[in-house]
Amino acid sequence: MMEVESSYSDFISCDRTGRRNAVPDIQGDSEAVSVRKLAGDMGELALEGAEGQAEGSTPDKEASSQPESSDANTSS
């Protein structure tokens, strides 16, 4: 019971609010990343994701058609 009480008092004494398992505040130089650079990086991620989905969907269709044809061969 003492273990629970000590962790509770540690949590209450800290300056964090909200959910108990929330991410703590990030300390450091916040000026190191500019909004312009972040927006550019986000744009690149969106483009890479769209390309990856287009390429990734083609093999899935081929893979799904292969088991169907093999199932048809086994039931004949």
Curated annotation (Swiss-Prot):
Ranges annotated as spanning the membrane: none
Chain segments carrying region Disordered: 1-25, 43-76
Gene Ontology molecular function terms on file: cAMP-dependent protein kinase inhibitor activity
InterPro entries: cAMP_dep_PKI (IPR004171)
Biased composition (Polar residues): 1-10, 64-76
Record key words, sorted: Protein kinase inhibitor
GO terms classed as biological process: negative regulation of protein import into nucleus; negative regulation of transcription by RNA polymerase II
Source taxon at top rank: Eukaryota
Signal peptide: none
Compositionally biased region (Low complexity): 43-56
Protein task: Extremely potent competitive inhibitor of cAMP-dependent protein kinase activity, this protein interacts with the catalytic subunit of the enzyme after the cAMP-induced dissociation of its regulatory chains.
Membership in a protein family: Belongs to the PKI family.
Record-given protein name: cAMP-dependent protein kinase inhibitor gamma
Gene designation per UniProt: Pkig
